[in-house]
Amino acid sequence: MATDIFNSKNLAVQAQKKILGKMASSKYIATSLIDDTSGEVLDELYQVTREYTQNKKDAEKITKNLIKTVIKLAVLYRNNQFNEEEIGLMEKFKRKVHQLAMTVVSFYQVEYTFDRNVLSKLLNECRELLHQVIQRHLTAKSHGRVNNVFDHFSNCEFLAALYNPFGPYKKHLQRLCNGVNKMLDEDNI
């Protein structure tokens, strides 16, 4: 005899994750779910990724994967799906992302302080914490999306190109850091 237990709340969360994951594929719908400043930061990340990779499809995939991950994480968080240990990991993840954001801006604002290894290490620490937070909740495909995003942004060559003061991405970095700084000021990261 099957012991399947129907739980409407779990079903609703699964549906939300699925629907919002699909909706994140549409730029129009994704921007309606994300505030203006975050949208501007995501647009800059897309632009610099597209120019760096010289591949529109890869840049779109990385950006979509980032948006889908953020939306699914928000759905889980808002629906109280995390146990006590995961809540602790989530808080640690949020602090690490805040530290990363402050470091990104600091490296831009203070000349000769940029260290690609420091940024790459922080990004990889965020990745590991995120995997731990979502381990029980999201599929292997979602974990692959996380890796796709972090593999790109933690790449030391990408970071060096982005922060090169004489490189082609200087304006992108400026707009990116202005947006991240605004998110920090608004306590949004």
UniProtKB/Swiss-Prot annotation:
It comes from Xenopus laevis. Disulfide bonds: none annotated. This is Tumor necrosis factor alpha-induced protein 8. Keywords: Apoptosis, Cytoplasm. One of its GO terms (molecular function) is cysteine-type endopeptidase inhibitor activity involved in apoptotic process. The gene is tnfaip8. Its main location: cytoplasm. It is found in: Cytoplasm. One of its GO terms (cellular component) is cytoplasm. Gene3D superfamilies: Tumor necrosis factor alpha-induced protein 8-like.
